């Protein structure tokens, strides 16, 4: 059945991903995502607000369903239309090449390294601003006496002690 023959009830019941497969199969060419959504909206006589939730799921399905291929610029087609070599070419990431620097290059004063541009812009930032406190602020409270480690008491739960003893006993049984 062709996509143009769908009734509103059929559009309501069918998933957008299945309708997209039928639509692309009927058209035989790649389509922009927004054009696909506009086709669905027209078929079901929907307002944008009515299908907003379905569009989110549809986009997720497009990316995860193996039948579809994003061929760039938000254009979608069917994977069946492309050979393996075409698919690898269309979805292969482009790698930006960088020159490898040697010792002479590092000494070159005219050479800008990645990230140096951003550092130059930060030169006018003061080391301390008015809203910062000094570390040696006289208003800070002085600690009169330090706490001695022998004064610290740590309370342990009896349940934790029992578990530790059981683990220790299990280890002794294991070693026997």
From Swiss-Prot:
Residues 114-176 are annotated as: Disordered. The keyword Transcription applies. Residues 116-145, 153-176 have a biased composition (Acidic residues). It holds the Pfam family HARE-HTH. Participates in both the initiation and recycling phases of transcription. In the presence of the delta subunit, RNAP displays an increased specificity of transcription, a decreased affinity for nucleic acids, and an increased efficiency of RNA synthesis because of enhanced recycling. The gene is rpoE. One of its GO terms (biological process) is regulation of DNA-templated transcription. It comes from the Bacteria. It comes from Staphylococcus aureus (strain NCTC 8325 / PS 47). Belongs to the RpoE family. One of its GO terms (molecular function) is DNA-directed RNA polymerase activity. RNAP is composed of a core of 2 alpha, a beta and a beta' subunits. The core is associated with a delta subunit and one of several sigma factors. InterPro entries: Asxl_HARE-HTH (IPR007759), RNAP_delta_N_dom_sf (IPR038087), RpoE (IPR029757). Residues 14-81 form the HTH HARE-type domain. Keywords: DNA-directed RNA polymerase, Nucleotidyltransferase, Transcription, Transferase. This is Probable DNA-directed RNA polymerase subunit delta. GO terms for cellular component: DNA-directed RNA polymerase complex.
